[in-house]
Amino acid sequence: MSEKYVVTWDMLQIHARKLASRLLPADQWKGIIAVSRGGLVPAGILARELGIRYVDTVCIASYNHDNQGELKVLKRAEGDGEGFIVIDDLVDTGGTAKAIREMYPKAHFVTIFAKPAGRPLVDDYEVDIPQGTWIEQPWDMAVTFVAPLSAK
């Protein structure tokens, strides 16, 4: 990955709320399925904004911080996804998205961020990201002290 796109908590909240506004009316949904781990925080925001209390998870391991590896389903939510929103933070190459589509063919699959290779696999997303860009999510970062330039 050549570029980095840093996401702050504020940015994530704004993007998730914009996405939630397009998922109204909320009474059309039975619940939300969060793709663990990237979809957990966005799912919480969507659940709040839409007033949805039923939130389940599908647990898929594919990344080890900045390396994408073999896809492994650790836990899945029951059903075919009918009436459910499935949320992940990002669709990248489409590996996870293809697995989600197979497991939940009737779900409405959304992400906050989408790269070109994965875009056709989601029903909606909020932010376009170039394919070669690595996204730094706020839950993967910490605020640290940086010395002033004059002190170096």
Curated annotation (Swiss-Prot):
It is an enzyme of class 2 (transferase). Belongs to the purine/pyrimidine phosphoribosyltransferase family. XGPT subfamily. It is a peripheral membrane protein. Its main location: membrane. PANTHER family: XANTHINE PHOSPHORIBOSYLTRANSFERASE, XANTHINE-GUANINE PHOSPHORIBOSYLTRANSFERASE. One of its GO terms (molecular function) is magnesium ion binding. GO terms for biological process: GMP salvage; IMP salvage; purine ribonucleoside salvage; XMP salvage. Xanthine binds at D92, I135. Mg(2+) binds at D89. This is Xanthine-guanine phosphoribosyltransferase. Keywords: Cell inner membrane, Cell membrane, Glycosyltransferase, Magnesium, Membrane, Metal-binding, Purine salvage, Transferase. It catalyses: GMP + diphosphate = guanine + 5-phospho-alpha-D-ribose 1-diphosphate; XMP + diphosphate = xanthine + 5-phospho-alpha-D-ribose 1-diphosphate; IMP + diphosphate = hypoxanthine + 5-phospho-alpha-D-ribose 1-diphosphate. Purine salvage pathway enzyme that catalyzes the transfer of the ribosyl-5-phosphate group from 5-phospho-alpha-D-ribose 1-diphosphate (PRPP) to the N9 position of the 6-oxopurines guanine and xanthine to form the corresponding ribonucleotides GMP (guanosine 5'-monophosphate) and XMP (xanthosine 5'-monophosphate), with the release of PPi. To a lesser extent, also acts on hypoxanthine. PROSITE patterns: PUR_PYR_PR_TRANSFER. InterPro entries: PRibTrfase_dom (IPR000836), PRTase-like (IPR029057), Xanthine_Guanine_PRibTrfase (IPR023747). Homotetramer. Pathway: Purine metabolism; GMP biosynthesis via salvage pathway; GMP from guanine: step 1/1; Purine metabolism; XMP biosynthesis via salvage pathway; XMP from xanthine: step 1/1. One of its GO terms (cellular component) is plasma membrane.
